[in-house]
């Protein structure tokens, strides 16, 4: 089966595993998925991320995070820039997700960054997703 949007598939798998209260999620690896997973870890949305190398493309193991009473840390994930409709923002037009409570993940010339990091580095780019 040919997958037209692997990033949307990755975000949907995280959303579904989160809704079902799974502890661990495994997805086929790619560089952009690794970058997104590392940003989610760095920003505190997931517990841990492991990259498992195999003879093929590898696997990313994401350990989801929940609050002390089982409440979800990730409320929602939204794919913004899609293969059929790319969304680019200049550095002065970078979005704030829920007035700074969420993050926007951007693909920039400096690599994958959050909206806050892109503002600090003074770069714009393609808005991959919103997470809150």
From Swiss-Prot:
Q: Which PANTHER family match?
A: 40S RIBOSOMAL PROTEIN S15A
| Record InterPro entries | Ribosomal_uS8, Ribosomal_uS8_CS, Ribosomal_uS8_sf
The record's keywords, sorted A to Z, are: Ribonucleoprotein, Ribosomal protein, RNA-binding, rRNA-binding
> What role is this protein assigned?
One of the primary rRNA binding proteins, it binds directly to 16S rRNA central domain where it helps coordinate assembly of the platform of the 30S subunit.
The family line of this record is: Belongs to the universal ribosomal protein uS8 family.
Database matches in Pfam families: Ribosomal_S8 (PF00410)
GO biological process terms on file: translation
Q: A single GO CC term, please?
A: ribosome
What does the record give under GO molecular function? Answer: rRNA binding; structural constituent of ribosome
Keyword match rRNA-binding:
yes
Q: What is this protein called?
A: Small ribosomal subunit protein uS8
Q: What SUPFAM superfamilies does UniProt report for this protein, alphabetically?
A: Ribosomal protein S8 (SSF56047)
Oligomer status and interactors: Part of the 30S ribosomal subunit. Contacts proteins S5 and S12.
